[in-house]
Amino acid sequence: MTFSALRRHFLLASLTLTLGAGLLGQAQAADDLLAQIKSKGEVRVGLEGTYPPFSFQDENGKLAGFEVDFSNLIAKELGATAKLQPTKWDGILAALESKRLDLVINQVTISEERKKKYDFSDAYTVSGIQALVRKGDEGKYDAPEKLAGVKVGVGLGTNYEQWLREHVPQADVRTYEDDPTKFQDLRSGRIDVILVDRLAAFDMVNKTKGAMALTGAPFARQEAGIALRKGNPELLAALNKAIEKFRADGTLKKLSEKWFQADVTQ
């Protein structure tokens, strides 16, 4: 091989390596969701928007609530703004899988089953599965076994439905796509009990001025984390870093006390 041919071969090899590295870098950047979020300056967050005090529409029609505030704080730590996308619960994780959402911040309980499909941040609230009844019925349904044969309302596809079917298969399970209808059916007597997040139950008792009541201690402990698609370690690390910061500087506690008058974050 002549010197000129050798030189051409070397230049072609160098060019190939350079182009290959560039394409690899572009592919990695395309796959790095955190980088995409920072580049766009926007993170798409899924929440229900009908689940007070976590997310709901205020008197002006604007989204408000604990998880609305929390989403905005998280987005700021990621160098972006939160694009809040109200989504029904039974489709919210599917929207995450199909990449219509980047994150779901909607009291998604961390469970071993869900961890097979999604990654979760560290927990940002700690609660439990709470039975909520009409005032005066507290003693009737204060244990899981007392729900056998009883009309129990749960959100469709929620961990409450799953827990009820697993632990009280004799219950008369009534599923709902939205919370307002479920609460209305309890008040009107169409169902006897609803299973909800303990924190949401406290809020409902306050709003109904004592027309509803908790049956006692929660039936099971649950922790909620931010759900995201697997394969985004940089984003997961950034979320955990933000949550740890908010926990350490008291931001999470203040936010909790604003919406629940108690610290529900640990």
What role is predicted for each listed range?
Residues G91, V108-K116, W163-E166, R187-A220:
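A ligand-binding cleft/hinge motif common to bilobed small-molecule-binding domains
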Residues V126-V133, T181, R198-E244, F260-Q266:
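Periplasmic-binding protein-like
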Residues V43-R44, G79-T81, S98-N106, V150-K151, ...:
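Alpha-to-beta junction loops
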Residues N72, K76, T81-K146, M212-A213, ...:
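Acidic, polar ligand-binding/catalytic clefts
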Residues D69-E77, D137, V150-K151, G155-N159, ...:
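Extended ligand-binding regions for polar small-molecule ligands
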Residues V68, L84-A94, G139, R174-Q184, ...:
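Short helix-initiation/N-cap motifs at beta->coil->alpha
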Residues A29-Q107, K116, D249:
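Extracytoplasmic small-molecule ligand-binding "clamshell" domains
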Residues G41-L47, A143-G157:
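Short loop->beta-strand "edge-of-pocket" segments that line small-molecule binding or catalytic clefts
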